[in-house]
Regions:
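Active-site glycine-centered loops adjacent to acidic/histidine catalytic or metal-binding residues
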Residues: 21, 47, 109, 133
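Hydrophobic alpha-helical segments, especially N-terminal targeting/anchoring helices
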Residues: 58-59, 107, 113, 213
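Short, charged, surface-exposed hinge/linker loops at domain edges
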Residues: 232-248
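AMP-binding/adenylate-forming catalytic core of the ANL superfamily
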Residues: 55, 75, 80, 103, ...
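Short, P/G- and charge-enriched loop/turn segments at secondary-structure junctions
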Residues: 38-45, 96-99
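Gly/Ser/Thr-rich phosphate-binding loop
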Residues: 1-41, 54, 61-63, 88
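Conserved ATP/PPi-binding loop(s) of AMP-dependent carboxylate-activating enzymes
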Residues: 48-52, 63-97, 136, 231-233
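Short proline/glycine- and acidic-rich turn/helix-capping motifs at secondary-structure junctions
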Residues: 205-215
Length: 248
């Protein structure tokens, strides 16, 4: 989040050096490798590929996309030493990581590479929705929604649509004493439209008592997707409050 990094640098007087890694990799794969003499940083980027990792940005058909265009973040196989070589009791799951894009490890993240080679991670591919052929980051929308007065927590998900493929829907948990559900929803829709354009405009904002979360605080977005798409779902064993889905 560039705004958070800017705030931290301004208030601490120290540089914030970002990086990106996964448990499966055992080591940062995108970083600013100061020890190699390259101190370049770019706002909003995790950095450059660490030596030993070769990244590519591919579309859903496995074709490379142009610099600046978002796509699936993958790493050429074989992975560097220290990366995972199996998944415990889940050989099929391990193999699936390399099957979607033959010759590459599928990170499950979406992002893009800019003209200078810096890699920008937009979020999980599950959090990227395809609206009328355009890939939109729900994370960007959530930042705007969360910044609205009266919003305590939020989640933006993609609802199925017969014409556009998907449309963005927001679930909002309001703060005590906010200015009414309809006013809050209207302000939120307007704010997202103003900052991201009509294509990313929220189709609907649902103000709900609570959002479904795990006991560790992670919002169960997949559960919200199933609810809004009228799909059958099971209550996850990790959910914090089993009454929340019924209330939504």
């Amino acid at each position: 989040d560039p705004d958070t990094i800017d705030w931290l640098e301004q208030n601490s007087g120290l540089p914030v050096i970002d990086h990106w890694w996964q448990t499966e990799l055992g080591w940062p794969a995108i970083a600013t490798c100061i020890g190699l003499g390259d101190r370049r940083r770019k706002r909003g980027s995790a950095g450059l590929a660490v030596p030993g990792y070769e990244f590519a940005i591919l579309d859903d058909h496995g074709k490379p996309v142009a610099e600046g265009d978002s796509g699936n973040v993958v790493i050429r196989a074989p992975l560097a030493p220290g990366a995972f070589r199996t998944l415990w009791n889940n050989k099929a799951g391990y193999e699936k990581n390399f099957a979607t894009f033959p010759g590459f490890y599928e990170t499950g993240d979406a992002g893009y590479r800019d003209l200078d080679g810096f890699l920008h991670i937009m979020g999980r591919t599950d959090d990227i929705i395809n609206v009328a052929g355009h890939r939109l980051s729900t994370g960007q929308m959530e930042q705007i929604v969360a910044s609205q007065d009266g919003v305590a927590e939020c989640a933006v998900i993609g609802a199925d649509d017969p014409i556009k493929g998907m449309i963005p829907i927001a679930f909002v948990s309001a703060r005590t004493g906010h200015d009414g559900d309809e006013a809050l929803a209207s302000r939120t829709v307007e704010a997202v439209r103003d900052e991201l354009g009509a294509l990313a405009a929220l189709k609907k904002v649902y103000v709900v008592p609570q959002l479904p979360k795990t006991r560790s605080g992670k919002i169960l977005r997949n559960l919200l997707r199933k609810i809004v798409n009228s799909e059958p779902f099971e209550i996850p064993p990790t959910i914090e409050d089993t009454s929340v889905p019924a209330a939504i």
